[in-house]
Structure formats: C-alpha cells, structure tokens
Amino acid sequence: MSDSPNVLIIFTDQQRWDSVGVYGSPMNLTPNLDAMARRGVKFDVALTNQPVCAPARACLLTGQYASAHGVWRNGIGLKVGDWTLAHCFKRAGYEVGYIGKWHLAPGECGAGAVPPEYRAGFVDFWEASNVLEFTSKPYDTTLFDADG
C-alpha cells in the first residue's frame, strides 16, 4: 500500500463554508485547515442533505440519504453491518482509524467506550467518544481507545 496516498477526512460540525480561509474568510481562523486544503483535495461544490452532526456524518460515511441509513436525527446509531467508507478503504488495503466525536452508536452504549461492533468498520485505530459533552472542551476531553 506504500504507493497509495494517505487519505485524511476532516469533518467539522456546524462550520459554514465561508468561515474557512481557503474558501474566502478573511479572518484567519483556520490556518491549518487552509494549509492542508492547499496541498490536498478540497471540494468547491458540496452540500449536506442533513445539516445536523450525527445524520450528516452517517450520510458521509455511508453515501446514503438519512431515509436509507436511518440516522435522521441525533441519538440514533448506524445499524451494525452498514457498509461505510471505512470498509471500502480497508478492502483497498488501507489501515482505517477514527478520532473524535463519534455520535453514531446507539444510545444504550451510554457514555463509556463504543463497542467494536458499533464502530462502522474503523478497526485499526480508535480514539473516540460517543458523547458530545466528552469532546466539546479542547483542554478537557475524554476519548476512549480501542480497549475502552
């Protein structure tokens, strides 16, 4: 896989397109995102059909509308076995990992670690939390590794 490029998908919540410098913001709020966008691939015409965090993330990961994958509001998890980008990249020989707020496991998972079956194919690296409140403070964040 050494000839294949690295792929990093950064998915921010509730961030307007015009708040990012590479898309025209003069405020210099996102210098690192801007630098990565200039060196990589950025999308100039894109939209989400579900502008709420968990449904939007589920749409991106599955390539489906919320009416197909079932995550039409926060608090609903992806179904175990749903095919995602992680599965596609893994099949192509990539190592796949996830870092950050997950918010796609069912509510009964609670505030602890997300069990492997609810990680939607991210099997090689996991550093995440299913609870928004655990990931909202930049200097006081709780993430769980693969072992919980």
Model-assigned labels for residue ranges:
Residues M1-G148:
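Formylglycine-dependent sulfatase
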